[in-house]
Structure formats: structure tokens, C-alpha cells
Amino acid sequence: MNSLLVNKAAIVTGGSRGIGFGIAKLFAEHGANVQIWGINEEAGKSAAQDLSDKTGSKVSFALVDVSKNDMVSAQVQKFLAEYGTIDVVVNNAGITRDSLLMRMSEEEWSSVIDTNLGSIYNVCSAVIRPMIKARSGAIVNISSIVGLRGSPGQTNYAAAKAGIIGFSKALSKEVGSKNIRVNCIAPGFIDTDMTKGLSDNLKNEWLKGVPLGRVGTPEEIAMAALFLASNQSSYITGQVLSVDGGMA
């Protein structure tokens, strides 16, 4: 077992697959007690059991819709009762409802904003008091290259992901004096279920804009998250780490 997060208590939202699963796995490999939050109970419990078996760390699952403030607050209290502290939070949960703005429904707009951006408020506002009390904590918010440069058909997603960056920079200034660090990761074109559904033509068009000429992996995002969650980045806060093969 590696040792960057030994005995740290970590929450990873949207951790049952893709980037979130990669982050939860690497954290567990580095000794963290990890709780995966998600809305698919079967997938979440399976992922948690798989990681527990493979890493030897304590990995659990909690059924939490991060767009629901009361649900988030209740689970934070349960987490504190079990672990006594919250050392690391990774806000990774997110959805897409792509459409050109002229065709985008209010529901498509609101659902993405509520889940991708509203959840950041819900989770951070619930964990920040115990972190302040402990005078310690690391928050890693997963944004996107789309939040930095935009993408047609994704005004809702781009607005949410750009909002995450602004939120994180502001919060980092509020809580830095309490030894709490808040940073963002902006992934580029990453090999996940979301990108697997794209046509070959669209994938090839995306790859033309990637100087490194390939798709990234969830493990590469996880390495960035591990860095920002651990003391390896103890003097870094309010920053956006682009992991995008040079796209930005």
C-alpha cells in the first residue's frame, strides 16, 4: 500500500464509475477510508466492495442525490458520526443534457445546473463547518475543459463547469486561513462511458485538438486528484489543474 492518504477520511461523489471510480480506487490504494456517493445503489455497492477487496482499505457506499441539500446534509452527519472527521472531499458527480441553446428546454438547463453546480454548494456548505472546526481539509472539485473554453451544444454544462471554477476560487479565499485548500481539476477528453458513446467521427474531431494525440484515462485524472488531496500540494489552493493533453 502507498501512503499519501493513510487513515484519511474521504468522500468521492459520483465514485462508482469513470473518473470518480478511478479517484476512489487510487485514494483507497493510498490508505484512505473512502465513501462513494451516488444514486445507483447496485453499482455503488458493487464498486465499494470491489475496491475494499482489492485495496484492503475501508470503502463504503452511500445513496445520496447530491442535488438534494437535505440528503447531503444528513449523510455528512452520518459520515462524521462514523469517522469523526472529513479530511478530503472530491466533488465529481455530474450529468450532461446536451442541446443547442435554441432547442434547450428549461428542464435540460436546470437539471445540469442543479446537479453539476448546485451539488458543489450542497456538499461544500455541509462539510465546511467540520473542516473549519478541525482546521484542516482538502476539497477537489472536478470541472472540465468545457468550463474553460466552451463547447457548442453544451451551454448548460459549460456554465456549470465554469461556475465550479469561480466558486472554488472564491471559497479558497474564504477558508485558506483555516488551513483548508480548495482546488479544481479540468479534465479534457477522457476515456469514460460518456465519451465511449460518441461516434468515431466526433472522437476523431476531438483528437485533432489534443496536442498529445490521444484520449486521457480516469487514472490520469485520479493522479491529479491524489496530488491535490494530499500534503504533496500543501501550498496550493484556488487553482485549476488542466489535465487535457494540451487542449486548453
UniProtKB/Swiss-Prot annotation:
Substrate binds at residue 144. Pathway: Lipid metabolism; fatty acid biosynthesis. GO terms for biological process: fatty acid biosynthetic process. Disulfide bonds: none annotated. SUPFAM superfamilies: NAD(P)-binding Rossmann-fold domains. It comes from the Bacteria. Its EC number is 1.1.1.100. One of its GO terms (molecular function) is NAD binding. Keywords: Fatty acid biosynthesis, Fatty acid metabolism, Lipid biosynthesis, Lipid metabolism, NADP, Oxidoreductase. It catalyses: a (3R)-hydroxyacyl-[ACP] + NADP(+) = a 3-oxoacyl-[ACP] + NADPH + H(+). The active site is at residue 157. NADP(+) binds at residues 14-17, 65-66, 92, 157-161, 190. Catalyzes the NADPH-dependent reduction of beta-ketoacyl-ACP substrates to beta-hydroxyacyl-ACP products, the first reductive step in the elongation cycle of fatty acid biosynthesis. Belongs to the short-chain dehydrogenases/reductases (SDR) family. PANTHER family: 3-OXOACYL-(ACYL-CARRIER-PROTEIN) REDUCTASE, 3-OXOACYL-[ACYL-CARRIER-PROTEIN] REDUCTASE FABG. Homotetramer. NCBIfam families: 3oxo_ACP_reduc, PRK05653.1-1, PRK07231.1, PRK12826.1-2. This is 3-oxoacyl-[acyl-carrier-protein] reductase FabG.
